[in-house]
Structures are given as C-alpha cells and as structure tokens.
From Swiss-Prot:
Mitochondrial polymerase processivity subunit. It regulates the polymerase and exonuclease activities promoting processive DNA synthesis. Binds to ss-DNA. GO terms for molecular function: DNA binding. GO terms for biological process: mitochondrial DNA replication. CDD domains: GlyRS-like_core, Pol_gamma_b_Cterm. Heterotrimer composed of a catalytic subunit and a homodimer of accessory subunits. Its main location: mitochondrion. InterPro entries: aa-tRNA-synth_II/BPL/LPL, Anticodon-bd, Anticodon-bd_dom_sf, Gly-tRNA_synthase/POLG2, GlyRS-like_core, POLG2_C. This is DNA polymerase subunit gamma-2, mitochondrial. GO terms for cellular component: cytoplasm; gamma DNA polymerase complex; mitochondrial matrix; mitochondrion.
Amino acid sequence: MLLTLKNTGQLLVAACSKVARSLAKYHPRVNHHRHCVWCSKRGLTTGGTAQKQDILFHLCQQRHFLSGETLTCTSLVQGCHNLGPLGVELKRNLVAQWWNSVVVYREQVLGIDTLHHLSTPSSAPEKPLLAICTQHLKELPRDQLVKWLEDPAGKLEFLRHELLYGALLEYVPSMELLNKKMPFGLAEIGKCFHSIPEERNKGTILPRIGERTVASLVWFSSPKSSGQWQDYWLRQRLQWWQKFAQSPSGFSCNDIQDGQGRKSSLIQYEFPWGRETIETLCNMDDSALFQMHPGCTTKLQARDGRKSVVPHVVWVSGDLDRGILAYLSDALQQTEAPAVRGQYHQREVLKLHPTLAPIKVAVDMGKGPTGELRLVCQGLSSELREQGVYVWPGYQETLHGSLEQLYTKYDKMGVLFTVLVSESTLENGLLQVRSRDTTLKETIHVSKVKDFLVRYIAAAGNL
C-alpha cells in the first residue's frame, strides 16, 4: 500500500482507536475527573446574559485580551483561542498568585516541571493524543507499518492530558528529599492537551486539538487524614478563587461521586452561557501510586509519625485559562458615562482585581510643550517600572482624543490609574491621578506619585 498524507491520517486514526481500546482499563478515576471537567451542559440564556456575553467577547478582542477568528463560548471553553498582549499579562499575574499561594507561602509543597509527553499510557485519556512523526510512517515498509498498527501503544509517546502523571512519577525522589515525611505536596503548572469532541470535527480526518494551562497540586498524606485534607484544600481553593472576584458568589462548589462512591468536588463559575468547572479536587486513595509503581510497596512507604504507610493522594487540578475567562466575566461592569450633548450612554469598565490587572498605570500627557512633557512621562514611567509596575506608555500615541475617550479606553483595558502630566506639572510639579474604580481625580506632586501607586498596589495584594 502506497502511503499518502490522506491514508496516513486514516492509519493514525485506526491506531488511536486501537490504543484507546487497549487503555480502557487504565485510570478510571482520571477519566471520571475528565468527564466532570469537559462535559458540562451549557444553555445560552436570552436577554441580559446573552448581551453581556456579546459585550465580553467584543471587549476581549477589541482590547487584545483574547484573539481568534471567531470567539464563542464553546471555542473558549475548549481551548481553541490565543491570548493577546493584555491576556498574557493577566495570565502571568494569575499564575504568580497561584504559585505564591500553593508553593511559596507553604513549607510542605515542592515545585516540579515534567515533560509534555508521556512514555507510558497509564494515565492517558480514553482517546489519547499520540506524538507521531508522519514522515517516519510514510517511509516505513508495509510489513513494518502493519506490525506497528497491531501494537502501537508500546512504541509511542502520548501528549499529556493531565499533570497527575508527572507528580506520581516524581513522588519517590521528592519523598527522599523530605526524608520520607508526610504530608507533602507536588505542584506544577503546564500545558495539557485534549481532543475536541467529534461533533466539532465533521469532515476532517484527524481530530482538532485543544490546549489549556493546568495548575496541579498532588497532595500525599496518611490514609486516616486524607479526607480531612481534601476538605481543607477545598476550602483553601474556593477562598482563593473568590478572593480576586468582584462578585465572590459567582464561584461555587459542588460535590459528585464516581462509580465507586468516592467523592470529588468541583469549583465552578457561573458564566453568562452557563456554569463551567474551573477546578476539580478528588481523593484517589493509594491506587494511583500503585498503578504508577506496581510491585513497589516498600519504596512507596512514607513516615506518618512512627508508622510507615503508603500515602493516599488528594489531587487538585485547575484550568487557569478558564480562570482567566471567569475573572474577565466577573470584572466586566457597565456604568453610566457622562452626558455628551445631553445624551447618556453605558460604558464598559473592566474592574479586575489590582493584583491581576495587566496594566497598573497609564501615563499620558495633556496640553503643553510636547518634548518637555514627554521627558517627564518617560522619567516617571522608568521609576515605576523599576518597582515592577507595568506601565502603559500612552504619551507615545500620536492620535489624541478627548480625556473622556482616553479614560473610556483605559477602563476597558482594566487600567488601575491614569496619570496625566500637563503644562502645570512643568510649573509646580503637580499632576493628576485618576482612579479606575472611583473615577475620582487627585492632584499629587510628581515626587510622591511613585510611592503612592506602589503602596496602593502592594496593599491590594494583601487583601
């Protein structure tokens, strides 16, 4: 049989199906978790929620938080979109907050970083994504290709669907580092991949691939305390998600049970189009470790006081890309803008939490000698950047509108403060600082602006 690009794709589909059948017995707990995360029912409501959804998608594209040919709730949830510059900064801030909360501020959690591809299918999804070189397949003789198709699982690597596998693999060396003392956790943030449901791939040979950034904590504790730890981490994680929200009630928790009666907890957010799972917590007892390390009971034992036992696993897995969507949806508010020619209208404000807002300060200049004002703006921006403050250089823009148009644009970008340098700044050192949340304008001396803004941002992080 002559291999072409088309029939090579068909052969890959056949191989994937064969691998899927051979892996059906593996990791039912992981498959149950996956079903909880990706198969939620969505029904778009009409009226205000539908309007908010349209406004949200338009704003995210207009202000470059998200990008893609067409943004829909399905494409966003399935991970088929890109992040624009502001989305990247928002994500970077969210990742930093997660890492600080789970790793930096705790004594018993270690960070790890594992490979994107798996060498064993023990935690592969029901329809695994295989890492295959099609050129190599096309060069294989027919007899070798047939032999490969008969048993592909042992000769391939799989793109990871979850981060659990890497943590279980790193359990033994990490336990040795901690002198085999429990409890402890392994945390990781990384990309994971999944196939798009078949109804989205009609007319195509190979399935589309979606991706998401997953934040995972795998917690190892004694069997007798694993249930308490699961409850503890559920409280911690729900409080963490609610901490940065304008409306904390948008995040909620629901408990479910798998076929074996084991409890899992879902942290969900109420989007305009329906409820979606943001994070999942489940107690996997000791079966996950035994599946990863068969026949190694002694090697898996850790110290629980004077006893040595195989720990139970509590797994926390969060989708940070959905978290970004949740906070964008939560932050979007409509306020009444000042009247223009006697007409009032609504304008959008993105009230992101100060620690998550991608741009903290925008520096602009008003009327006056352009060259001198630009030098003041550049100096102030440099001072703020040295303090780790992300500054938007509005003074470099060549197209200038009214101040209200400027404030409207920055409100949609979620900018916390707008600093306006004007001719009076050159005369007496005073400039104007406008707050996104209150719309109040305060006059501050240029020498005190940096300390004022840095203190505010630092204080917001401690709320």
